[in-house]
C-alpha cells in the first residue's frame, strides 16, 4: 500500500459527521441531550459528533426547583408560546438567529441539524436560509422531529419557495402537542422530503424499529463523503 492510499484510508476513517442539535420549547441543550441518549446510542456505529446548544431566551418560572427552560422565540407579549396559533409577535427571534450564526462560526462547520418541536420549526427556517448565497448558515441535511410550519407572520417569507435541503420528517401518530398533520404540512414545503410516522406521541422515537430510519438517512451523507474522497 502506497502513502497516497494510506492517506485516503486515514481520511475516511477519521471523517465524522457533525450534527447541530436544536431542542424544543421548555428545554435546554442539557435536557435535550439527556432525552436523546437512546437516540445517540442507537447511532453509535455511525461516526457522528452531536453538538447541543441552548436557546438564548429563558422562559420565566415561578418554581425555584424547576430546571431552567428556554425557547427560541415567544409568540405573545407575555413571553409565552403557542405553536399552532397565528401570531404577528415574535419576541427573541432576532437574538436567536444572531446566536445560531455565532454557533456556526465558532463551532461549525456542520453537516446536518437534528431538532425537535419548536427547534424543528426553527430548523425549517434555517433550511431556507441555507440556500441563500453567502449565508453563514450552511449544512447538508436536517432531521426534524415533531416539526411544524412557524405560525409567525414574520416567517412566512421563508416558505414562499420550495426549500432545497435534504430533510427527514419524523412525527407521531398520536402526538397531542403537535398533531401529525402539522408535521406533514411542513414536509410539503421541502423538495423530496423523507417522512416517517411512528405510532407514539410527542417524543424522539429511538427504539430498534425506528433507528434504521435515521441510519439509512444519515448514511447517505457518509457515502457521499466516501465517494468524494475516492474520486480525489
Where are the model-predicted features located?
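Short alpha-helix in the alpha/beta-hydrolase fold that links the catalytic acid
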Residues: 34-37, 156-157, 179-188
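Gly/Ala-rich beta-loop-alpha elbow adjacent to hydrolase catalytic centers
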Residues: 114-123
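Short beta-strand/loop motif that positions the catalytic acidic residue
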Residues: 163, 168-171, 175
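Catalytic histidine neighborhood in serine/cysteine hydrolases
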Residues: 188-205
